[in-house]
Amino acid sequence: MTQTAMSPAEFERALRAKGAYYHIHHPFQVAMYEGRSTREQIRGWVANRFYYQVNIPLKDAAILANCPDREVRREWVQRILDHDGGPGEEGGIEAWLRLGEAVGLDREQLLSQELVLPGVRFAVDAYVNFARRASWQEAAGSSLTELFAPTIHQSRLDTWPRHYPWIEAGGYDYFRRRLKEARRDVEHGLRITLAHFATREAQARMLEILQFKLDILWSMLDAMSMAYELDRPPYHTVTHERVWHRGTIL
């Protein structure tokens, strides 16, 4: 027997309920906003999240490439400009580089991606590859972890300056700009998702896709926790060198 589709309001509530699994609840994140993280842990997080930041425009470009709807493309392309920047405008990637400098990382070291852990790289690459293979509607819906993003950005702005006075204030610009951008992106992404996933089967699939994205964010922090909290980076039993691949073979 076919189940009745959720109403748009019910479906939105189901999507928002996934916030219970957002990475704001990961112990590594909790430690950061409670002021228990070391400088090495903060720097490790910034360096690894940079790989996520530079891949977001690739994810969004994949969505645009698969989308035949001009009106959707006109609105979605703003996400790429937000990260890459436009004429005379600094983008989010540049803002993240300044965050890296604010926590004491070398800009060239960030750009080299030499600190990116394999587990983080695999998780981010899985997200980009999903966006390339999936329908544009499914890939757009996977971005709805942004429903929960303003809370995590605000928590950093509220707690990090107090707990980590050694971080230069200019580094927080990325989080401030994303507060506004994420809310705008959520409105568009939610509109697409509620319009295109109208059967119970499609809604169930979209909820599973959103869980997939949550799994990616959580898995990234699992890799960082192993390396920076438990002092068990890859190959720690045989070497202290960062011997893992840098993505250049893929």
Swiss-Prot record:
Its EC number is 1.3.3.11. Ring cyclization and eight-electron oxidation of 3a-(2-amino-2-carboxyethyl)-4,5-dioxo-4,5,6,7,8,9-hexahydroquinoline-7,9-dicarboxylic-acid to PQQ. This is Pyrroloquinoline-quinone synthase. It comes from the Bacteria. The keyword Oxidoreductase applies. Pathway: Cofactor biosynthesis; pyrroloquinoline quinone biosynthesis. GO terms for molecular function: pyrroloquinoline-quinone synthase activity. GO terms for biological process: pyrroloquinoline quinone biosynthetic process; sulfur compound metabolic process. It is an enzyme of class 1 (oxidoreductase). Belongs to the PqqC family. SUPFAM superfamilies: Heme oxygenase-like. It catalyses: 6-(2-amino-2-carboxyethyl)-7,8-dioxo-1,2,3,4,7,8-hexahydroquinoline-2,4-dicarboxylate + 3 O2 = pyrroloquinoline quinone + 2 H2O2 + 2 H2O + H(+). Keywords: Oxidoreductase, PQQ biosynthesis.
